[in-house]
A protein has these predicted regions:
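ABC ATPase nucleotide-binding domains
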Residues: 257-283
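Helix-to-loop junction immediately C-terminal to a conserved catalytic motif
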Residues: 71
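Conserved structural motif at the start of ABC-family nucleotide-binding domains
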Residues: 25, 39-42
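The feature captures the beta-strand-to-loop junction immediately N-terminal to the Walker
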Residues: 56-58
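Conserved ABC transporter NBD signature motif
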Residues: 79-87, 96
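Catalytic Walker B motif of ABC-type/P-loop ATPase nucleotide-binding domains
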Residues: 182-186, 191
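Conserved ABC ATPase signature
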Residues: 132, 157-161, 165
Length: 283
């Protein structure tokens, strides 16, 4: 399967770029473990510049663990993660933070924090001991709040926000960091469908308007099909398929990766694949 960026969905279509995109993140022979339990085993994958990549797979297959490793939040037992061609663990922490933003699953913040306080934390990698806060920092925070539609809620406590607004605040913090490479671990968790679409529309706009490279872990196959250029499918700690939504979301692969019998139809809006579950395979 190819990882070449295509846009079967006219809603996702961006201006064509004739240059060959470079690989921003890659994993080679990546093995990840917690204590003696191996979660990811010998994984290879590439994240291409200027694309939205969704990682899918059944529960416990290692999606979030792989994302943590790509974001330099855990060291591999073996193998290597490369950021722009360099071993990510040999790149200084501050330099990584100026290039790569990570939003973990279910992030938490101290009580009493306002939206603006949270977003300002995204500027920490840009600060030095001799220059704690500057006009550039203020501008970056304001721009991030405006981009996520939260400027009017800047002084509101986080606990007063709806689930969708709170998730936007966390994304705003990552935006304020000023990176062009974003890793989002299940950014739609615990949100109703309207807020899921709202958050993913925001992510798509960040990709379109800012040219950002985005990697997301998602559970909803049809949302992954709608918003992704590339889908990486995992099972039992390995990548079993990688390609465009149409290449990956086939009845055979859904059976092999998810033990799911499904009909794959054409999405009437995007023209891409639409997964209609039938039942568990073999039952």
């Amino acid at each position: 399967m190819t990882t070449e960026q295509t846009h079967p969905n006219p809603l996702l279509a961006a201006p064509a770029d004739t240059e060959t995109p470079r690989t921003r993140l890659s994993a080679r022979g990546l093995t990840l473990a917690y204590d003696e339990r191996t979660i990811v085993d010998g994984l290879d994958t590439d994240i291409v510049e200027g694309t939205v990549t969704c990682v899918i797979g059944p529960n416990g297959c290692g999606k979030s663990t792989m994302l943590r490793a790509l974001g330099r939040l855990m060291r591999p037992r073996s193998g290597v993660v490369e950021l722009d061609g360099r071993d990510i663990h040999r790149v200084p922490t501050r330099e990584v933070a100026q290039v790569l933003g990570v939003l973990p699953q279910q992030p938490t913040a101290p009580d009493g924090l306002t939206v603006a306080d949270l977003v300002a934390r995204g500027r920490h990698p840009s600060q030095r001991w001799y220059r704690q806060w500057s006009g550039d920092d203020h501008q970056a925070v304001s721009a991030a709040l405006e981009r996520t539609g939260l400027l009017e809620l800047a002084d509101s406590p986080l606990e007063e926000l709806s689930g969708g607004q709170r998730q936007r605040a966390w994304i705003s913090m990552v935006l304020a960091q000023g990176t062009d490479l974003l890793l989002l671990d299940e950014p739609t968790t615990f949100l109703d469908l309207v807020h899921q679409v709202d958050v993913l529309d925001l992510v798509r706009d960040l990709h379109w308007q800012g040219g950002r490279t985005i990697v997301m872990v998602l559970h909803d196959l049809n949302l992954a099909a709608r918003y992704a250029d590339t889908i990486i499918t995992m099972r039992e700690g390995r990548v079993v398929a990688s390609g465009t939504p149409a290449e990956v979301l086939t009845p055979q692969l859904l059976r092999e990766a998810f033990d799911l019998e499904a009909v794959v139809a054409e999405d009437p809006v995007s023209g891409g694949p639409l997964v209609v579950p039938v039942g568990r395979a073999g039952h």
